[in-house]
UniProtKB/Swiss-Prot annotation:
<feature type="binding site">
    <location>
        <position position="135"/>
    </location>
    <ligand>
        <name>substrate</name>
    </ligand>
</feature>
<feature type="binding site">
    <location>
        <begin position="268"/>
        <end position="271"/>
    </location>
    <ligand>
        <name>substrate</name>
    </ligand>
</feature>
<dbReference type="GO" id="GO:0006096">
    <property type="term" value="P:glycolytic process"/>
</dbReference>
<feature type="binding site">
    <location>
        <position position="450"/>
    </location>
    <ligand>
        <name>Mn(2+) 2</name>
    </ligand>
</feature>
<feature type="binding site">
    <location>
        <position position="341"/>
    </location>
    <ligand>
        <name>substrate</name>
    </ligand>
</feature>
<comment type="subunit">
    <text>Monomer.</text>
</comment>
<feature type="binding site">
    <location>
        <position position="467"/>
    </location>
    <ligand>
        <name>Mn(2+) 1</name>
    </ligand>
</feature>
<feature type="binding site">
    <location>
        <position position="408"/>
    </location>
    <ligand>
        <name>Mn(2+) 1</name>
    </ligand>
</feature>
<feature type="binding site">
    <location>
        <position position="24"/>
    </location>
    <ligand>
        <name>Mn(2+) 2</name>
    </ligand>
</feature>
<dbReference type="InterPro" id="IPR017850">
    <property type="entry name" value="Alkaline_phosphatase_core_sf"/>
</dbReference>
<feature type="binding site">
    <location>
        <begin position="165"/>
        <end position="166"/>
    </location>
    <ligand>
        <name>substrate</name>
    </ligand>
</feature>
<keyword id="KW-0413">Isomerase</keyword>
<feature type="active site" description="Phosphoserine intermediate">
    <location>
        <position position="74"/>
    </location>
</feature>
<keyword id="KW-0479">Metal-binding</keyword>
<dbReference type="GO" id="GO:0004619">
    <property type="term" value="F:phosphoglycerate mutase activity"/>
</dbReference>
<feature type="binding site">
    <location>
        <position position="203"/>
    </location>
    <ligand>
        <name>substrate</name>
    </ligand>
</feature>
<dbReference type="InterPro" id="IPR036646">
    <property type="entry name" value="PGAM_B_sf"/>
</dbReference>
Length: 540
């Protein structure tokens, strides 16, 4: 370990920081075809990969507490990085509850069913309808239909948000067929509306999008489509509009009314929050609401602490996280990202805690306000880098964490040229971080939270807009004032690791103890040591 005092290595009287750069969506895939990372100009990352200790780690499936072969995502990735252990994710918790028939034992749903039986109100089921597993899962919706039938709720309206981002761009009809089968099997349910996630799941306060979803759910004067849901999709595709951008469409007269109940079955909070805020907060001011139905609302998980809703699956509390350890040792830390990824380096990395820790400073850089990020592939990366360089060179932060959103957000558009530009932008920014960290004698650790931009087209020839299950890189650039002792002449990063090993690695670089609760293992080892057959820790 370092001979410095508890995490505060200094360079000319200033703290030499440990910097964690998370390249969101930067996965590893050897094949060049349809790979925006391998085909982009990346002189900095290429040079670092060849000159410094590096490895590949797992960022999907069991390595992050998800089912095998389930792609990782930003929420899960940042939670796992911050926890230093594998956490059983909400997808797994809820799926197990549905599969074992225990959904009807959930207190929030029991209470909702009882109130709706008394009031004779309609049960509305709202959420992303796909098997992407990032924000929701169609099996959970099917489970809700069977629960509603068993609970004696016969007035059930389905408001389906179409995906096309974590799934193929024109796959909604497949999910419609599954839902129609579930409606027939359960004997309850009516398709009431369709809406692309572009409108219903914004997270950047683009209220002009959210209001479109709000109105199709609440406005009694909305026109009702004269054609079937399948025909709505076909017409949308014919106009060049894919699932993500599907225009909000009313399919029946089953809109939200006073006394109705609502279950929002998305389990990931960040893209569900705005719509639920608009439906529940009495002092909401994002846009004028012509209709404000009084609803009895249950959300699958906690989207925000102050929402007037019941929560079906409350969060499991976590302690001894990376940020907490740094804070408890009296060290200062800096977290920065642009709007699209700001909750991930703060809220999610801190285990769902919204308030900053003692000594934790946060800096938000606004993302450009464009319809899709292929129109601005550089996003706000340069401004973000400038703010991070200032934090690094301030000499007051022991730990600096920055997230670059470009590979993920531009990768989601499926536009190859734009993704290549995004990758090259991030590569250039890493060069600036490297110079700044080096001037301070600090250490730079580079990794990613999941894959995305390394695959831009699927085998069917359609644009690939989803995440991947590919591993992600880790590169360690050791600083002069952060040299680790006890490793002979040199160090290497072991193979066989996962995202849960990032926090233990950072704590070692900071010369801080790893809590027992962190089952992850440091990636650092001496070159002369045999590579351990590291096992991924099991979910807690």
């Amino acid at each position: 370990m370092s001979s410095s005092s508890s995490g505060n290595s200094r360079h000319f009287g200033r703290v030499a920081p440990v910097v964690l750069a998370i390249l969101d969506g930067w996965g590893h895939r050897e094949e060049l075809e349809h790979n925006s990372i391998r085909s982009a100009e990346t002189p900095i990352m290429d040079a670092l990969w060849h000159a410094y200790p590096h490895t590949l780690i797992e960022a999907s499936g069991a390595a992050v507490g998800l089912p095998d072969n389930q792609m990782g995502n930003s929420e899960v990735g940042h939670l796992t990085i911050g926890a230093g252990r594998v956490i059983r994710q909400e997808l797994v918790r809820i799926s197990e509850t549905v599969q074992t028939g225990r959904l009807g034992q959930t207190p929030a749903l029991i209470a909702l069913a009882e109130r709706l039986r008394k009031s004779d109100g309609t049960l509305h089921l709202l959420g992303l309808c796909s098997d992407g597993g990032v924000h929701s899962h169609i099996n959970h919706l099917c489970g809700l239909l069977h629960w509603a039938a068993a609970a004696g709720l016969n007035k059930v309206a389905l408001h389906l948000i179409t995906d096309g981002r974590d799934t193929p761009t024109q796959s909604a009809s497949n999910y419609l067929h599954q839902i129609e089968d579930a409606i027939n099997a359960s004997g309850v349910g009516e398709l009431a509306s369709l809406c692309g996630r572009y409108w219903a799941m914004d997270r950047d306060h683009r209220w002009e999008r959210t209001i479109r979803a709000y109105e199709v759910l609440t406005d009694p004067n909305q026109s009702i489509s004269r054609v079937t849901a399948e025909d709505v999709l076909s017409a949308s595709y014919a106009n060049g509009t894919t699932d993500e951008f599907l225009e909000p469409t009313r399919l029946s007269n089953n809109y939200f009314k006073d006394g109705d109940g609502l279950v929002m079955f998305n389990f990931r909070p960040d893209r569900a929050r705005q719509l639920v805020q608009s439906l529940t907060l009495p002092d909401f001011d994002g846009f004028p609401r012509a209709n404000q139905p009084s609803l009895d609302v249950v959300t699958f998980t906690q989207y925000e602490h102050d929402l007037p809703v019941a929560v079906a699956f409350p969060a499991e509390s976590l302690d001894d996280l990376l940020g907490q350890v740094v804070s408890e040792h009296g060290l200062r830390q800096y977290r920065t990202a642009e709007t699209e990824k700001y909750p991930h380096v703060t809220y999610f990395m801190n285990g769902g805690i919204e308030q900053p820790l003692a000594g934790e400073e946060r800096h938000l850089v606004p993302s450009p306000r464009v319809a899709t990020y292929d129109l601005a592939p550089a996003m706000s990366a340069d401004t973000l880098t400038e703010s991070c360089v200032k934090a690094i060179e301030s000499g007051v932060y022991s730990l600096v964490i920055i997230n670059y959103a470009n590979p993920d957000m531009v990768g989601h558009t499926g536009v190859m040229g734009a993704a290549q530009e995004a990758i090259s932008t991030v590569d250039r920014c890493i060069g600036r971080l490297l110079d700044s960290t080096g001037r301070m004698g600090g250490t730079l650790l580079i990794t990613a939270d999941h894959g995305n931009a390394e695959l831009m087209q699927g085998s069917d020839g359609q644009a690939w807009t989803a995440h991947t299950t590919n591993p992600v890189p880790v590169i360690l650039v050791e600083g002069e004032k952060r040299k680790l002792s006890g490793y002979g002449n040199d160090i290497q990063l072991r193979a066989g690791g996962g995202l849960a090993d990032i926090a233990p690695t950072l704590l070692q670089l900071l010369d801080l103890p790893k809590p027992d609760a962190m089952s992850g293992l440091t990636l650092i080892q001496a070159i002369e040591s045999p590579t351990p057959s590291a096992r991924l820790p099991q979910p807690v």
